[in-house]
Amino acid sequence: MTTKTRFAPSPTGFLHVGGARTALYSWLQARANNGEFVLRIEDTDIERSTQAACDAILEGMNWLGLTWDEGPYYQTKRFDRYNEIIAQMLEQGTAYKCYCSRERIDALREAQAANGEAQKYDGCCRDLPARDTDEPFVVRFKNPIGGSVVFDDHVRGRIEFSNDALDDLIIARTDGVPTYNFCVVVDDWDMGITCVVRGEDHINNTPRQINILKALGAPIPEYAHVSMILGDDGAKLSKRHGAVSVMQYRDDGYLPEALLNYLVRLGWSHGDQEVFSLEEMKQLFKLDDINKAPSAFNTEKLVWLNQHYIKTLDPEYVASHLQWHMDDQKIDTSNGPALSAVVTALAERAKTLKELAASSRYFYEDFAEFDAEQAKKHLRGVALEPLQLVQQKLAALTEWTVEAIHQAIEATATELEVGMGKVGMPLRVAVTGAGQSPGLDITLFLIGKARSEQRISKAIEFVADRINS
């Protein structure tokens, strides 16, 4: 039997990291078993579902590279199918119409609460004969009485629920709209889902859904309920812990590989290995290896992984993601070095692509003024001669190569009988406007000969004005 999994988000908000981890685990379960992965949009909550949220979910999945084999399916486009099954269940007696008013249901719950009883429907309409009436009604599933529902969860082991603790679930509201728990069952059945991976908040839905599947004569999928993600303070992860939307991590400068690697380790492990490529995840992933204890989100670990991938992935690939940040920061990369070369030069220093973009601006744009602190420290009178001499030597170069630039800087220090720092620091401030950059030879090479000479001239003029003031 082909393994078939699904990710079924509700489009009432953005794709958050908890949902992304669930999607990843479900995707990996399919890929690890040469199966299929289905994307389903559970939009039956019509009032809260939005197209913007749906678009954001698809954008997040695409950015992460979690491609789907079927879908996206939309529940709101399957109402005819749900109504067909409801009519069939009413005919077979596995569902019934309930005419109880809201007032009666509220009074029942109040009485049960006052008596310390579990709040559940009492089956008032369960065995009533059919009515020919225009009274509003809901449709309820006729849950089995007695016995229990038992299933083996890949994460939590054997779980058992007493049927007597379950009431007769509403499967269609008074307006005819089918409910979440019912739609999920029909979808999983129709789509041939063999394994359901979802959050632990769905555990209580599982016995209800299993009973409906049994009533329909449908196969029961396997289940894996993963634990929640906590903040580093032990509380449930929320906006106050930082970014929770997947695309916010994109905006903050994280690579999808880093986020995927981090998310897979929030509950799953393979020995003490920390770094996993997507291919390695597909080869090694097993649902049974997921820890049932909650995982704490640690931004420092995510940053570490991001640095690792910025440094180790193909610079051309990193540059393709960096371009978004260059555009976002309005840095025109058409007039300057290849972005992949900048990635190679700056990768060791960058924690995020957002930082990398900001620190690469001087390769593409001239700066209006020097950093005040660095200029005060390094563009002083003693810097005039080193700047003038190194400018002459750089101007005389017939080939603008990293090696030739390095030799020109060294020759300047040798000729002036000073340490490299006496030449290098004023030169660095001159061409970058600041005090930090990669090696000066590669920095000058990437900036280009003409632009480097112009900036050195500007620095010489700055120092001269300072001497004369």
UniProtKB/Swiss-Prot annotation:
Molecular function GO labels: ATP binding; glutamate-tRNA ligase activity; tRNA binding; zinc ion binding
Pfam annotation, one family: Anticodon_2
Keyword Cytoplasm: yes
UniProt key word Metal-binding: yes
Short motif ('KMSKS' region): ranges: 236-240
Reactions this protein catalyses: tRNA(Glu) + L-glutamate + ATP = L-glutamyl-tRNA(Glu) + AMP + diphosphate
Gene3D superfamilies in the record: 1.10.10.350, HUPs
Cofactor note (record): Binds 1 zinc ion per subunit.
Family: Belongs to the class-I aminoacyl-tRNA synthetase family. Glutamate--tRNA ligase type 1 subfamily.
Protein name, UniProt field: Glutamate--tRNA ligase
